[in-house]
Amino acid sequence: MKKIAIDAMGGDHAPKAIVEGVNQAIEAFSDIEVQLYGDQSRIESYLVKSDRVSIVHTDEKINSDDEPAKAIRRKKNASMVLAARAVKDGRADAVLSAGNTGALLAAGLFIIGRIKGVDRPGLLSTLPTVDGSGFDMLDLGANAENTAEHLHQYAILGSFYAKHVRGIAKPRIGLLNNGTEATKGDSLRKEVYNFLASDSSLQFIGNVEARDLMSGVADVVVADGFTGNAVLKSIEGTAMSIMGQLKSAIAVGGVKAKFGALLLKSSLYDLKDTLDYSSAGGAVLFGLKAPLVKSHGSSDAKAIFHTIKQVRTMLETDVVGQLVEEFSKESDVND
């Protein structure tokens, strides 16, 4: 049985969206147990009772405006902290939260801990492509500043995730840059390019540009945390703007526009599904000793369900255990 600790109080729509997503997951997957951390009375008002769901009551939670490291240290009974502690103590196999991103990353690093050999775990998410296959990108903001060695390791981590979780036999690795030529970019990008090009274990396809990401140019895209986060926000903003403009145009376009939208209903839903990457799950802080997944703060029940599904897949494939073994081999070789 796969045991998942969930911060029920994190996110804009907690605990309602969190608990309703759990209800859906419990019905869909018979091999998971969920531990919900948070206000018991509020959780119970949305929970469909199941012997595979338990509640750990706490009145304390981490707010969106709390300073991450201080919050983790001072709010020891916060729902997020208790969920991470359950993983640390072996009472749960993975942790999920839609709460304060910085605090969750801090909980991952300070409570769960890094895999030996991983310098800086990267925040990885599967983002949309026009053909629906998606691509993995990291780092999406766990580390604002990176060295070339860090980005090389992100490529290794991303390739490992794409192989073991998404089932891609030979993931194509691209380095996000301001041009596709090998000579493009600043000194960091050039150094990273040389690292990746000389690593025979990676299927490195070279530099990729931001404009080509959603066309599926690569299976894994590597970036420093600052750049990766900016690209993520751009994709989110573009998707919301496109859907917003379509809705607005239909609303003010009169009868013809509404009739046209009705005829295109199926295609419009397909477009919405393509741009909505919540069905791919949340962002993984990959490189920790256990799966830690951040769901978007605005997640609804559907997004939480898909994030639980993602966590279940990570546990089913034992991707973290295999990653520990891989880095252990690498450490032995280096020693």
UniProtKB/Swiss-Prot annotation:
> Is Lipid metabolism tagged as a keyword?
yes
Compartmental location: Cytoplasm
Gene3D superfamilies in the record, alphabetically? Isopropylmalate Dehydrogenase
Protein origin, superkingdom: Bacteria
Record-level GO BP terms: fatty acid biosynthetic process; phospholipid biosynthetic process
Q: Which reaction does it catalyse?
A: a fatty acyl-[ACP] + phosphate = an acyl phosphate + holo-[ACP]
Q: What's in the keyword line of the UniProt record?
A: Cytoplasm, Lipid biosynthesis, Lipid metabolism, Phospholipid biosynthesis, Phospholipid metabolism, Transferase
**What's the EC number here?**
2.3.1.274
Describe its assembly.
Homodimer. Probably interacts with PlsY.
HAMAP family in the cross-refs: PlsX
The entry's family comment says: Belongs to the PlsX family.
Which protein, by its recorded name, is this? Answer: Phosphate acyltransferase
Source species, please?
Streptococcus equi subsp. zooepidemicus (strain MGCS10565)
